[in-house]
Amino acid sequence: EGVVLDLLAHAHRRAHVDHDHERAMVALVRAMEACAQRQLFKQYKIKTWDVQPEQLPDAMRDTCRTCYLDDVDGKYKLPLQSQFRVLAGLGDQMGQAFLRDWPKMKPLFDAANHAVLGHGFEAIKAERVQQLSDVVMKLTGVSESSLPKFPNLNL
């Protein structure tokens, strides 16, 4: 949970202090992934970077075997959206919430992917960062007041 809080706090600093929307967006996406990874490992002992297909819900096993095999190290690796699909398939509330909210989130993830720090050349708008931040905070159950803050030094 500490990593998720740190990533969310980092995203908020990038957005509100530095006005660096690209880095804020990257940190928000990573916070979501870290949250899914934590839940998968803590609750189900699933490592997203070394998945055993037998650990997954039946409906996802064939997809894992055909789509997620790393040809270099021979390990199955789940991408972000699939991590939440697995959680949902296992009956996890966070995974189910992700799937329910996916239609609202997809344009935000697309914006992150089309940004320079993603895979494209488009600028990130501040409102997109705020929208994704709102979604991530809701999905993770984190309140802004629980985010770590740096102390103010009066020098």
PLM segments and residue spans:
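TPR-adjacent "capping" and linker segments in tetratricopeptide-repeat scaffold/adaptor proteins
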Residues: 1-2, 100
